[in-house]
């Protein structure tokens, strides 16, 4: 999968999508939701079914995160994407924030109302991100809440299916070692550490 520079976005679609997401957030009992440009694998390239940030905002850059509250929304991007973020999003919906100067945790600490409850999909954030966000919200009496269901996925009616392709085993010359040797070493490590599983 390679990044496409021919992607066209339509910011006019965002208003209806954000409204549906906000209704879902109200049903879930949260004030806001974080939408990163990430998938469950934290890779640089995400499949179409994981382009949540592009779907909700219109922004198609390769890095960013949106914070959508009931009354306001922000798109955090680094300097590479400031102009693209402004061009691809509805300025009546999204305020562009410099991700480097004001990371989401720092922003939430100072800009969200006391007691704000922000939901997130724990599959789409690293543990370190979640800790920073939880700490920032906690300082204002708020909470970061891991949601069982991604509310954006629930309102994305025409979401593409996940990719389904055959698994390809790389020859030893590319992988360095045979898969059976790697698995044997992993099994030995599990046994040596008295673990029952490895992820």
Regions found by a protein language model. Give the residues of each.
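Terminal domain-start leader segments
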Residues: 1-199
């Amino acid at each position: 999968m390679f990044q496409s520079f021919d992607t066209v976005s339509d910011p006019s679609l965002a208003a209806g999508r954000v409204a549906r997401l906000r209704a879902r957030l109200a049903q879930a009992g949260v004030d806001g939701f974080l939408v990163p440009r990430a998938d469950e694998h934290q890779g640089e390239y995400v499949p179409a079914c994981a382009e949540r940030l592009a779907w909700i905002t219109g922004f198609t850059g390769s890095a960013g995160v949106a914070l959508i509250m009931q009354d306001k929304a922000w798109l955090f991007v680094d300097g590479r994407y400031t102009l693209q973020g402004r061009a691809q999003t509805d300025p009546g919906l999204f305020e562009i924030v410099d991700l480097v100067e004001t990371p989401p945790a720092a922003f939430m600490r100072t800009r969200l109302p006391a007691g704000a409850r922000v939901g997130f999909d724990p599959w789409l954030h690293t543990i370190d991100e979640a800790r920073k966000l939880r700490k920032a919200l906690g300082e204002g009496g708020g909470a970061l809440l891991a949601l069982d269901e991604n509310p954006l996925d629930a309102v994305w009616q025409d979401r593409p299916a996940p990719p389904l392709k055959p698994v390809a085993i790389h020859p030893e010359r590319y992988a360095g070692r045979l898969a059976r040797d790697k698995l044997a070493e992993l099994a030995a490590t599990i046994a040596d550490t008295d673990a029952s599983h490895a992820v």
